[in-house]
């Protein structure tokens, strides 16, 4: 019953950080990258099997709690810093010590900001195409195809790959 109460709460801090020291909360999206899977976007969820918070991928695999601090990065920080080229300005994201008052760090969620990310991708790359098929979003950027169940997640996946691999 304790786990049910935890899940109903508001973005519960889970007691660990990502590999850059950012506190992780229930429902946060994180980035994991390795040589085998490449770049993956996972969500912090309570796993009833292991009875702990894990980073769960849409395909069903997860990163266990004890590995979160060494294997994950908060998605919002990766998108803002690496893809949008912004920095922390007090409680806001901004540029050149100028905070963007519509981008408070605490509330910025890149999965919900897919319009901003898709528009930015569209300005940088001429070859941008999206389609939904069998409940899955497919996004093509510069001849590279990305797919996920949520449009916001596939947009973030493409943005991170483009930023890190200079697609």
Which role does the model predict for each range below?
Residues 1-167:
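Secondary-structure transition motif
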